[in-house]
Structure formats: structure tokens, C-alpha cells
Regions:
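Histidine-acidic metal/acid-base catalytic patches
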Residues: 1-23, 28-30, 56, 62, ...
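A generic secondary-structure micro-motif detector
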Residues: 2, 46-47, 85, 123, ...
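Active-site acidic/histidine proton-transfer and metal-coordination neighborhood
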Residues: 17, 55-70, 76-184, 194, ...
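Glycine-rich, proline-tolerant flexible connector loops at the mouths of alpha/beta enzymes
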Residues: 25-58, 117
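Conserved radical SAM core fold
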Residues: 29-34, 77, 114-116, 151-153, ...
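Glycine-/proline-rich flexible loop or hinge segments
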Residues: 37-44, 72-80
Length: 282
């Protein structure tokens, strides 16, 4: 729901209902100023959530026939800045608690990454930070679904990006570290498109870890790529698009999901700037 930054919770659910959506992945950043684009949106104040407010939220969802697929918070819990890291982790715990209180049972997020350190060091950091988080969630019957976005788009995330959970190679390593059955994937095929990776095969290999899905597209600008190469800032050779306007083969993607019997949420993630000019366009 981050695209609906100017709407409050009720307004967001109203819009979803009017447009015929059956569920919403609800943005739950901390209250206050956003630190990045599509971040900082808070449709529920998880740190101040009471049983009374939770009941109001659930009642609104029931009346509008819109469920919450997940509570979403995508910070960098492995930030090289220790203060930022601890702040992100602290709020993530509140989001997990709120997901349990609201009987949502899902939190979608990033594992994070120290962008100045190599993969090997980040895996060690992951092994220290994430097992307690996943255990905390499991005790509250909450699944943790990690999106496969590298969070590497421009100079702000250079050089390593801000999320380690980027490829099947790394997924296998992280699932060895945390084999818990409530730790899985929020799969967005668009990130594999611009990295020129296979986005169909992982659906079959990781079928038991596939908890949540994003429908977002990417247009790979091959003329730009031919000039700047894969080591350029990614936004130099790709454009995020709404589903159907990029290079994802949605027929093959949905076919693979049906092959494995996926019956979870599929949420449209809008980061297409062509549709951000007004409320009507959004």
C-alpha cells in the first residue's frame, strides 16, 4: 500500500474495495518522515497498536471484504550504521507483534545488507541477527517473507545494495542458516528480469518457501545496457513498470504458480512513475 502514501488506513481499504481487490499488503513503517522513495508509509502505527484499535482495523476490513495479506516493512536490518540497524530491528519486532495481534500471520520485509562488506561477512551478520527475529515470529505464528529485491538502484545503495536476499544461490545458504518453516520468500519476478536471471525455475525449487508474491514488471532497456553494461547503476538500464508493460512473461509466471499449487496472495506493487502524477492515475 506504499503507493497510497496520501491515504490513511480507512481510505486505503476503501480504495482497495472500490477497485475490487480482495487483499492489501499494508505498509507499516515507523511514524515520521520517509527515508527513501516508497518507504516511510505507515497505514498502521504498529508501535502504538492496542487491542481496541486492532478490533477497529479488523472490523473495517470485514465490512469492505478486504483482507490483509501481510504487514509490510522493508528496512535495512543489517545496516553498517549500528544505530540505524537497531532502530530497524526494534520496529520490525513491533510489526511482527502487530501481525500476530491482527491474525494476519505474515510480515513481508528485507533481511538487509551492509553494503560496504562482502557477501561472506554479510552471511555471518545474517546468522547473528536473523535467527532471533524468526524465532520471535514463530512463537507468534507469524511467517517472515523476504523479498528478493537487491535494493541497488543508484548511488545511495552503492556498491553492494541493501538486501542480501537476491538469488537462489544465497537463498540456499540462508535457508541452511535458518531452516525454520516460517522463514520464506516474497517473490518478485521483476528483480530477476533486470539481473537477467531465470525467474521461473526458482518457483519450483522453492515451492515450500514461497509465502507471498509481488506482481511488478520491469522493462530492460537493452540499448542502454549495451552502452553502460551490467556494472552501471541499475536504473541506467531498466524501468519499473506495472504488470504487462515490461518484460515479465506473466503467462509463464502464473502457470508456474498454478503448477505448484500456490494459493497465497499476489499483490500488485506499483513503482511505475508513469502512474504517479495524480490520485486518479495512482
Amino acid at each position: 500500500s506504499s503507493i497510497l502514501a496520501d491515504w490513511d488506513f480507512k481510505g486505503t481499504i476503501d480504495v482497495a474495495s472500490e477497485l475490487g481487490f480482495s487483499c492489501v499488503e499494508l505498509a507499516c513503517w515507523p511514524q515520521g518522515k520517509a527515508e527513501r522513495r516508497y518507504g516511510g508509509v505507515s497505514h498502521i502505527d504498529t508501535e502504538g497498536l492496542t487491542k481496541e484499535r486492532a478490533a477497529e482495523i479488523l472490523d473495517c476490513c470485514r465490512q469492505k471484504k478486504v483482507s490483509l495479506s501481510s504487514l509490510a516493512y522493508y528496512p535495512n536490518t543489517m545496516d553498517g550504521d549500528a544505530a540505524k540497524r537497531e532502530k530497524a530491528i526494534e520496529h520490525l519486532y513491533s510489526v511482527i507483534e502487530a501481525s500476530s495481534m491482527l491474525s494476519v500471520g505474515m510480515v513481508t520485509t528485507f533481511v538487509g545488507r551492509d553494503s560496504q562488506k562482502p557477501v561472506e561477512v554479510n552471511l555471518e551478520l545474517f546468522a547473528k541477527i536473523w535467527p532471533p527475529i524468526v524465532k520471535f515470529a514463530k512463537e507468534r505464528n507469524v511467517k517472515i517473507a523476504i523479498e528478493n529485491c537487491p535494493m541497488l538502484f543508484g548511488i545511495d545503495q552503492w556498491p553492494g545494495g541493501q538486501n542480501l536476499f537476491t538469488s537462489p544461490v544465497l537463498w540456499r545458504e540462508m535457508f541452511k542458516i535458518i531452516p525454520d518453516d516460517n522463514f520464506g520468500i516474497n517473490f518478485d519476478p521483476s528483480h530477476f528480469v533486470w539481473q537477467q536471471m531465470d525467474y521461473i525455475r526458482p518457483i519450483y525449487e522453492f515451492r515450500d518457501r514461497l509465502f507471498h508474491v509481488h506482481f511488478k514488471d520491469i522493462k530492460l532497456l537493452r540499448d542502454k545496457l549495451a552502452e553502460c553494461g551490467v556494472l552501471a547503476y541499475p536504473l541506467a538500464f531498466m524501468l519499473p513498470k506495472i504488470p504487462g508493460l515490461g518484460d515479465v512473461d506473466w503467462g509463464k509466471f502464473v502457470s508456474a504458480l498454478t503448477d505448484i499449487g500456490y494459493d497465497g496472495a499476489a499483490c500488485i506493487e506499483v513503482e511505475d512513475r508513469s502512474f504517479e502524477g495524480s490520485r486518479d492515475m495512482i
